[in-house]
């Protein structure tokens, strides 16, 4: 693709240089207009010729080409700019057995048997997007069946309940213990998928324990939209210095992998684990419940979050010391609230449900070297959080958060980085320095893009991430590869001067006065020897 941000920057610089030249020469030559115009012609000709030549000689290639590594990485496998994608898990019903597919965009639940569509039901309510209780997308299975289940949170009966993960069920319309129906309300539930009671009863009778449940909760990207735009490199020869063992840059919206090195290599991830801990807690821990901090929760090494034995704190409030100060005590408290073993199993189940098939977790803190993942899987996690649990990303970028006697301070190195949208960093001896961050970057001509940057096995995550950010801002472009909007400056012909303005040229007040005095306010006279400029609109 030839459309690049670089030419527009050059044009703006040209405007500034020319404006400065005009100002300087007018002040120097005063009313001596002949000397003034001659100097302008000389300066403009030299400047524009250089700009045109530089733009013309730039090599323009697509991002799909291999990019050189740093000198330090020459002996290693080079990273590549790649146009692969990590999309939402593509759905196909099981060829043998039963499958439940829920589309929370169209609000439909469909049943399949041996790969064939059986029936489609209308979904009446789902968890509110962006809230604690947003219905989680992913791949699950029916865990339990109850003809009626009493919600410990809402204190209502949920008829014909099918539990598929943590506190989430598919069920009929709820009713109070008095027998009165639950009000219709806004169409949002506490996270469960509500059907009419009649439909839920029919689904309940058809469903078996372990029946697959596939839930789609993300706005679809049309294939044509993805093909219309793409990522391109401006200068293929420009080097990117990254010392991390593995890294990846991906577009959150399209799923495109832009840059990567060893992105499928399984590595320990340290406290990046806490993003999965936070995500799992929203699904399996009752929110806004009080938990008492027990002494054994505080025995784990590392950051404490200033939690004290015996104090009571809301389960939802523990997200803040967990993500802002990387509190290991907060992670252990959340896990032990419902049973540590069950919580860790739920972390692994959640990872599998959202497509993190090469990840496994052994604790809720990241201290264990057995908490492993890949850059690709962590990109999937970032994409899932951005599309389904924005609340967690918002929490992770708060500078401070106060609750009761506690004030937690964000220790992220990237908090003041332009465009930072949230994430988590970590460190252990086996993992070295790690980071998952989402950044909103101006790599498109008209719109910023949310890009996930994952760095694993780094000796300096801040430097590696900053180098990647600088490279993206200066050398990667996202746009539409169409010839009719291609920007191209031909080489200047001998004795020919051309100039393209990307905007207005702001002149000093003294220049305006001189033009009014000497040229009766006709600014085109400044360029009288340059007919193309003088006659231009």
Segments the model singles out, each with a brief description of its role:
Residues 7-53, 57, 95, 133-137, ...:
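Exported/periplasmic cell-wall-interacting domains
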Residues 28-95, 222, 228-240, 249, ...:
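N-terminal, intrinsically disordered, polar/charged segments of Gram-positive cell-envelope systems
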Residues 76-179:
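Gly/Pro-biased beta-strand-loop elements
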Residues 109, 453, 504:
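Divalent metal-coordination and catalytic microenvironments
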Residues 113, 144-146, 150, 199, ...:
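Sec/Tat-exported extracytoplasmic proteins
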Residues 226-246, 339-487:
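Penicillin-recognizing serine hydrolase domain
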Residues 227-376, 384-387:
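Active-site-adjacent loops and short helices of periplasmic peptidoglycan-processing enzymes
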Residues 473-537:
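Acidic, metal/ion-coordinating pockets
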């Amino acid at each position: 693709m030839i459309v690049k941000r670089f030419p527009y920057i050059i044009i703006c610089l040209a405007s500034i240089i020319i404006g400065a030249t005009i100002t300087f020469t007018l002040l120097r030559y005063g009313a001596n207009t002949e000397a003034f115009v001659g100097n302008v012609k000389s300066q403009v000709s030299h400047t524009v010729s250089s700009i045109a030549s530089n733009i013309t000689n730039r090599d323009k290639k697509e991002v799909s080409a291999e990019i050189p590594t740093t000198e330090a990485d020459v002996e290693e496998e080079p990273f590549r700019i790649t146009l692969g994608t990590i999309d939402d898990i593509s759905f196909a019903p099981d060829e043998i057995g039963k499958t439940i597919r829920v589309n929370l965009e169209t609000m439909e639940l469909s049943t399949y048997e041996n790969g064939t569509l059986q029936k489609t039901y209308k979904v009446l309510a789902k968890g509110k997007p962006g809230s604690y209780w947003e219905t989680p997308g992913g791949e699950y299975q029916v865990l339990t069946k109850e003809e009626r289940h009493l919600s410990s949170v809402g204190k209502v009966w949920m008829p014909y309940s099918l539990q598929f993960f943590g506190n989430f069920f598919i069920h009929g319309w709820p009713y109070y213990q008095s027998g009165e129906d639950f009000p219709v309300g806004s169409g949002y539930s506490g996270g469960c998928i509500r059907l009419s009671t009649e439909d839920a009863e029919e689904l309940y009778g058809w469903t078996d324990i372990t029946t697959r449940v596939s839930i789609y909760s993300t706005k679809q990207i049309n294939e044509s939209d993805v093909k219309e735009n793409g990522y391109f490199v401006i200068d293929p020869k420009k080097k990117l210095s990254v010392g991390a063992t593995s890294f990846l840059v991906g577009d959150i919206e399209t799923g495109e992998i832009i840059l990567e090195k060893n992105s499928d290599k399984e590595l320990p991830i340290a406290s990046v684990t806490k993003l999965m801990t936070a995500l799992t807690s929203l699904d399996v821990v009752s929110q806004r419940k009080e938990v008492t901090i027990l002494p054994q929760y505080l025995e784990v090494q590392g950051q404490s979050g200033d939690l004290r034995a015996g104090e009571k704190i809301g389960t939802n409030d523990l997200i803040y010391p967990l993500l802002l100060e990387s509190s290991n005590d907060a992670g252990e408290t959340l896990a032990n609230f419902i049973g540590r073993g069950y919580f860790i199993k739920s972390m692994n189940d959640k990872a599998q449900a959202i497509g993190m098939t090469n990840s496994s977790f052994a604790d809720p803190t990241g201290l264990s070297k057995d908490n492993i993942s890949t850059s690709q899987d962590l990109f999937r996690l970032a994409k899932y959080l951005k599309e389904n649990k924005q609340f967690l990303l918002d929490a992770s970028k708060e500078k401070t958060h106060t609750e009761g006697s506690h004030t937690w301070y964000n220790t992220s190195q990237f908090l003041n980085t332009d465009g930072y949208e949230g994430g988590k960093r970590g460190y252990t001896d086996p993992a070295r320095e790690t980071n998952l961050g989402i950044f909103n970057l101006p790599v498109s001509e008209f719109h910023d893009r949310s890009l996930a940057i994952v760095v694993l096995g780094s000796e300096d995550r801040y430097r590696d991430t900053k180098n990647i950010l600088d490279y993206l801002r200066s050398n990667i472009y996202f746009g539409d590869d169409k010839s009719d909007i291609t920007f191209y400056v031909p080489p200047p012909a001998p004795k020919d001067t051309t100039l393209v303005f990307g905007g207005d040229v702001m002149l000093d007040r003294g220049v305006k006065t001189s033009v009014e005095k000497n040229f009766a306010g006709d600014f085109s006279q400044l360029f009288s020897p340059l007919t193309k400029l003088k006659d231009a609109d």
